[in-house]
From Swiss-Prot:
Single Gene Ontology MF annotation: zinc ion binding
ZnF locations on chain (C2H2-type): 185-215
Upper classification of the organism: Eukaryota, Fungi, Dikarya, Ascomycota, Pezizomycotina
One CC-aspect GO term: nucleus
Gene disruption phenotype: Reduces transcription of TRI4 and TRI5 and does not produce trichothecenes but accumulates low levels of the trichothecene precursor trichodiene.
Subcellular location field: Nucleus
Superkingdom as given in the UniProt entry: Eukaryota
Function: Transcriptional activator of part of the core trichothecene biosynthesis cluster.
Record keyword Cytoplasm present: no
Keywords recorded for this protein, A-Z: Metal-binding, Nucleus, Zinc, Zinc-finger
GO BP of this protein: regulation of DNA-templated transcription
Protein name: Trichothecene biosynthesis transcription regulator TRI6
Amino acid sequence: MIYMASGTHYESWSALPLFDRVASPDHAKDFVPDLNDYESPTFEVDLLSENYDYDNFLTYSLPTVDPTKTLLHEEPLCFEGDFTNPAIDHYITTSSGLLDAVPSQLIALPSFTQPSKCPFPNCKSTTIFESGRDFRRHYRQHFKRFFCRYPDCSQSTQDIMEVGTKGFATRKDRARHESKHKPTVRCPWHDQEGQQCLRVFSRVDNMRDHYRRIHKC
């Protein structure tokens, strides 16, 4: 409650609660990369530093929206054990004719009623999941539902029946894989004449290994 003086009396009002605000929509999930309009990122970190967290390194962003892509329906649609639902074509996201990803709404999830381990067959996780959100995030990673968006890659597909046999469990795994198609991490070594090494890598750790083996005396 806030009080403000006004002449000889006080006026009071209450601040509006913050928890009723609606979250902003996540437009990033509808983005598809334009691989013909790519610019290498500018690095402001020491890629050779021992403390650099290169496991979380991403080599490019996905800035281009595909206006023809079908948006997801708000009501969840689940499968009964496999990806054979006839309505799936309406929900699939695509990139240049390739299957981009199968939405998480299409993965049938066991009901979460109490803290428990993952029930997926042969799951190696020993975590006791305390919330349904953490459980669902883990469970979906058992399904390879993200696919490479480079047409000639063995991890790309146009066939929905290949879901689960190729692809990646997370967007991060797919981004790490796709960086191999267009390496952007250049070796920072320069010779005495100022010429930079021409080797380019898709991963920071691979570049560091090259730098130590070839250039560091």
